[in-house]
């Protein structure tokens, strides 16, 4: 019975709340933060468990009242109402029972990089950036440009954003991979369609509770920042390169004039990249290999094609095709792709869990 499956979650929630009120925990900030997060993640399922228990009780009481001539009419109404609510509530609960991606509530670093296709790829990085900015705006999320490398022909060779807001990772995690674009460049006189590609990486923003890097494992190099064509060259050593020695991951940052600010930004991205690598290794070790994402989220996996001559956008993971490319891009309507992806993932996970 569903109530039996909900019981451990309710017990765990009550146990965490008890622990949070103990002086021993309140003095340990790191542990308290971790437990508070866990309690918050359990709240939705605990609320639904109460709602479900109330409906089950209502059904049982209404059935008992059916034998009472004075109460039978009212009991029938109550029973009908409760039984109509039950299937929808059960579906909601089944989805909540699925293993939750621990990163779903986190902010993200979104990195878009030009791949094959030269100038056309760089221009599409700019177009995809605008579409993501509109999407973030629709959601009420805050966006900060962390790092950018502009292309001479317009667009970007690479850009990294920090996106903050409610459940950012839970929606944008599906964007990781290769995005292929097919269109006629403005410089193309023969009207030939060119194919180019950009890669998107989605990394959760992490803090010291998620990952702690030993300063001994980090090599920091400082240098003078170089501007395009010798412009805006910083005469002080403000550019920073950080290397995490155990993983070999390197981050370079020169966007800010202050060395300290570049160090802070580089450290943020370094933590996110190391966390992502360790998380991928952990999931691969337990055989999940990024099942939390539809597809691997790997840069090399082609996830989507944007065909401008046909006004078509296709997501290859679920075979979804929409002939509204211009509108989706200009208005940032990514929910039209993300919602079906989430539904697909949930259906697969429910089947796997036997729910």
UniProtKB/Swiss-Prot annotation:
Gene3D superfamilies: 3.30.160.20, 3.30.70.1660, 6.10.140.1950. Its main location: cytoplasm. Keywords: Cytoplasm, Methylation, Protein biosynthesis. Belongs to the prokaryotic/mitochondrial release factor family. GO terms for cellular component: cytoplasm. It comes from Nautilia profundicola (strain ATCC BAA-1463 / DSM 18972 / AmH). The keyword Repeat does not apply. The keyword S-adenosyl-L-methionine does not apply. One of its GO terms (molecular function) is translation release factor activity, codon specific. This is Peptide chain release factor 1. Methylated by PrmC. Methylation increases the termination efficiency of RF1. SMART domains: PCRF. It is found in: Cytoplasm. It comes from the Bacteria. The modification N5-methylglutamine is found at residue 231. HAMAP family: Rel_fac_1 (MF_00093). Peptide chain release factor 1 directs the termination of translation in response to the peptide chain termination codons UAG and UAA.
